[in-house]
Amino acid sequence: MAKLSAKDIIDSLKEMSMLEIKDLIEAIETEFGVSAAAPVAVAAAPAGGAAAPSEVTVTLKDVGGNKVAVIKVVREITGLGLMEAKALVDNAPSKVKEGVKLADAENMKKQFAEAGATVEW
Protein backbone atom coordinates (compact mmCIF):
# COMPACT_ATOMS: atom_id res chain seq x y z
CA MET A 1 0.00 0.00 0.00
CA ALA A 2 1.34 3.41 -0.96
CA LYS A 3 2.07 5.81 1.88
CA LEU A 4 -0.27 8.83 1.90
CA SER A 5 1.09 12.28 2.61
CA ALA A 6 -0.62 14.70 4.97
CA LYS A 7 -1.70 16.74 1.92
CA ASP A 8 -3.35 13.67 0.35
CA ILE A 9 -5.29 13.02 3.55
CA ILE A 10 -6.38 16.66 3.85
CA ASP A 11 -7.49 16.70 0.21
CA SER A 12 -9.56 13.56 0.87
CA LEU A 13 -11.14 15.16 3.95
CA LYS A 14 -12.15 18.22 1.92
CA GLU A 15 -14.26 15.97 -0.30
CA MET A 16 -16.07 14.23 2.58
CA SER A 17 -19.40 15.22 4.12
CA MET A 18 -19.61 16.08 7.81
CA LEU A 19 -21.32 12.74 8.48
CA GLU A 20 -18.49 10.84 6.77
CA ILE A 21 -15.90 12.79 8.79
CA LYS A 22 -17.81 12.03 12.01
CA ASP A 23 -17.77 8.31 11.14
CA LEU A 24 -14.04 8.53 10.36
CA ILE A 25 -13.33 10.16 13.73
CA GLU A 26 -15.27 7.43 15.53
CA ALA A 27 -13.34 4.74 13.62
CA ILE A 28 -10.01 6.37 14.52
CA GLU A 29 -11.04 6.61 18.19
CA THR A 30 -11.96 2.91 18.21
CA GLU A 31 -8.89 1.74 16.28
CA PHE A 32 -6.33 3.63 18.33
CA GLY A 33 -8.14 3.83 21.68
CA VAL A 34 -8.06 7.63 21.78
CA SER A 35 -10.59 10.43 22.16
CA ALA A 36 -11.04 13.38 19.80
CA ALA A 37 -12.20 15.56 22.70
CA ALA A 38 -9.82 18.41 23.38
CA PRO A 39 -8.14 18.31 26.78
CA VAL A 40 -9.68 20.79 29.17
CA ALA A 41 -7.31 22.98 31.13
CA VAL A 42 -8.51 23.92 34.57
CA ALA A 43 -7.84 27.56 35.32
CA ALA A 44 -8.17 29.33 38.63
CA ALA A 45 -11.31 31.42 39.01
CA PRO A 46 -10.79 35.18 38.82
CA ALA A 47 -10.79 36.96 42.17
CA GLY A 48 -13.90 38.99 41.30
CA GLY A 49 -16.01 35.96 40.43
CA ALA A 50 -16.54 34.23 37.11
CA ALA A 51 -17.52 36.43 34.21
CA ALA A 52 -19.99 35.23 31.61
CA PRO A 53 -18.24 33.71 28.60
CA SER A 54 -18.24 35.84 25.47
CA GLU A 55 -18.46 32.79 23.18
CA VAL A 56 -20.27 29.51 23.78
CA THR A 57 -20.94 26.16 22.12
CA VAL A 58 -24.63 25.62 21.38
CA THR A 59 -25.64 22.01 22.07
CA LEU A 60 -28.92 20.41 20.99
CA LYS A 61 -30.11 18.48 24.06
CA ASP A 62 -33.65 17.38 23.18
CA VAL A 63 -35.39 17.38 19.80
CA GLY A 64 -38.94 17.47 21.10
CA GLY A 65 -41.91 16.38 19.01
CA ASN A 66 -41.32 18.22 15.73
CA LYS A 67 -38.12 16.75 14.33
CA VAL A 68 -38.67 18.23 10.85
CA ALA A 69 -38.87 21.77 12.24
CA VAL A 70 -35.71 21.20 14.28
CA ILE A 71 -33.85 19.93 11.19
CA LYS A 72 -34.89 23.10 9.35
CA VAL A 73 -33.52 25.26 12.17
CA VAL A 74 -30.25 23.30 12.20
CA ARG A 75 -29.88 23.76 8.43
CA GLU A 76 -30.62 27.48 8.70
CA ILE A 77 -28.12 28.04 11.51
CA THR A 78 -25.29 25.79 10.30
CA GLY A 79 -25.67 25.73 6.53
CA LEU A 80 -25.48 21.91 6.61
CA GLY A 81 -27.13 19.78 3.95
CA LEU A 82 -30.31 17.86 4.69
CA MET A 83 -28.62 14.54 5.50
CA GLU A 84 -25.97 16.12 7.73
CA ALA A 85 -28.59 18.17 9.60
CA LYS A 86 -30.78 15.08 10.05
CA ALA A 87 -27.80 13.10 11.39
CA LEU A 88 -27.00 15.88 13.87
CA VAL A 89 -30.62 15.92 15.09
CA ASP A 90 -30.84 12.11 15.23
CA ASN A 91 -27.67 11.96 17.35
CA ALA A 92 -28.80 14.50 19.97
CA PRO A 93 -27.33 15.54 22.30
CA SER A 94 -24.93 17.04 19.77
CA LYS A 95 -23.00 20.25 19.18
CA VAL A 96 -24.78 22.56 16.76
CA LYS A 97 -22.25 25.39 16.58
CA GLU A 98 -19.08 26.38 18.43
CA GLY A 99 -17.66 29.82 19.14
CA VAL A 100 -21.05 31.56 19.08
CA LYS A 101 -21.43 34.99 20.64
CA LEU A 102 -23.78 34.92 23.61
CA ALA A 103 -26.36 37.20 21.95
CA ASP A 104 -26.42 34.98 18.84
CA ALA A 105 -26.73 31.89 21.06
CA GLU A 106 -29.79 33.41 22.73
CA ASN A 107 -31.38 33.96 19.29
CA MET A 108 -30.59 30.35 18.35
CA LYS A 109 -32.12 29.15 21.60
CA LYS A 110 -35.30 31.06 20.76
CA GLN A 111 -35.41 29.51 17.25
CA PHE A 112 -34.98 26.01 18.65
CA ALA A 113 -37.60 26.64 21.34
CA GLU A 114 -40.09 27.71 18.66
CA ALA A 115 -39.39 24.40 16.88
CA GLY A 116 -39.93 22.50 20.15
CA ALA A 117 -36.29 21.65 20.84
CA THR A 118 -34.09 22.30 23.86
CA VAL A 119 -30.54 23.66 23.58
CA GLU A 120 -27.94 24.70 26.12
CA TRP A 121 -24.37 25.94 26.33
Swiss-Prot record:
Keywords: Ribonucleoprotein, Ribosomal protein. One of its GO terms (cellular component) is cytosolic large ribosomal subunit. GO terms for biological process: translation. InterPro entries: Ribosomal_bL12, Ribosomal_bL12_C, Ribosomal_bL12_C/ClpS-like, Ribosomal_bL12_oligo, Ribosomal_bL12_oligo_N_sf. GO terms for molecular function: mRNA binding; structural constituent of ribosome. Forms part of the ribosomal stalk which helps the ribosome interact with GTP-bound translation factors. Is thus essential for accurate translation. This is Large ribosomal subunit protein bL12. It comes from Malacoplasma penetrans (strain HF-2) (Mycoplasma penetrans).
